[in-house]
């Protein structure tokens, strides 16, 4: 259920702001969004997996915090990112 190393590298290179950028909010939000999508698919088939559901809620909260931070610092980057990721806002 976790992200493969190849997929993680692809996401980092796609959303990175510089060559070796792995910690920018854009990269972190993209990685969290991928994990959230994987957990959502898992929960569609395993509806009673409450431990995974709690993990999903924690990831969503973490992503929400990073999105709030990015919106507070640079609204243009925030708008571009949610458009690229297809998040509803």
From Swiss-Prot:
**UniProt keyword Disulfide bond, yes or no:** no
Q: What is this protein called?
A: Small ribosomal subunit protein uS15
| Gene assigned in the entry | rpsO
Q: What does this protein do?
A: One of the primary rRNA binding proteins, it binds directly to 16S rRNA where it helps nucleate assembly of the platform of the 30S subunit by binding and bridging several RNA helices of the 16S rRNA. Forms an intersubunit bridge (bridge B4) with the 23S rRNA of the 50S subunit in the ribosome.
Oligomer status and interactors: Part of the 30S ribosomal subunit. Forms a bridge to the 50S subunit in the 70S ribosome, contacting the 23S rRNA.
Name the InterPro entries on file. Answer: Ribosomal_uS15, Ribosomal_uS15_bac-type, uS15_NS1_RNA-bd_sf
GO CC, one annotated term: cytosolic small ribosomal subunit
Its taxonomic path starts at:
Bacteria, Pseudomonadati, Pseudomonadota, Alphaproteobacteria, Acetobacterales
Keyword annotations for this protein, in alphabetical order, are: Ribonucleoprotein, Ribosomal protein, RNA-binding, rRNA-binding
The scientific name of the source species is Granulibacter bethesdensis (strain ATCC BAA-1260 / CGDNIH1)
């Amino acid at each position: 259920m976790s992200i493969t190393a190849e997929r993680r590298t692809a996401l980092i290179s796609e959303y990175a702001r510089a060559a070796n950028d792995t910690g920018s909010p854009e990269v972190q939000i993209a990685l969290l969004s991928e994990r959230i999508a994987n957990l959502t698919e898992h929960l569609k088939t395993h509806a009673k997996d409450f431990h995974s559901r709690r993990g999903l809620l924690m990831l969503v909260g973490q992503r929400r915090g990073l999105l709030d931070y990015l919106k507070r610092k640079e609204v243009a980057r925030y708008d571009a990112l949610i458009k690229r990721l297809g998040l509803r806002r």
